[in-house]
Amino acid sequence: MQDSREKKQCLIFVRNNANDRADRIEAYAKKSGMKVVETIFNTDKKAVERLRYYIERDVIICVLVRDVVDISMELNEIKAVMTLAAEHGISINAESRGYEPALISYE
């Protein structure tokens, strides 16, 4: 049986109720052969917690965002999420970077 990571599953994470942005990113995911597990709108305090849930369970290969600041306005929280994702081999790919993996500076 094929494990879930081999199915190219991704998660979409967008700020607020940006339905048009979410639709655009979802279209990119489908065009790239990825299955969208969930689209999370960062409208409440549990949004980042749900993002961490998916990362920790290794059920996705990447998180698609417009920009990493959609995850949080707090730099420490962004770094924590990106570090967790890296530890699990999951990339956070930003539309603003042409869907290339976002990089984190440890300065």
Where are these regions (language model features)?
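Short, structured surface patches at the beginning of a domain
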Residues: 1-107
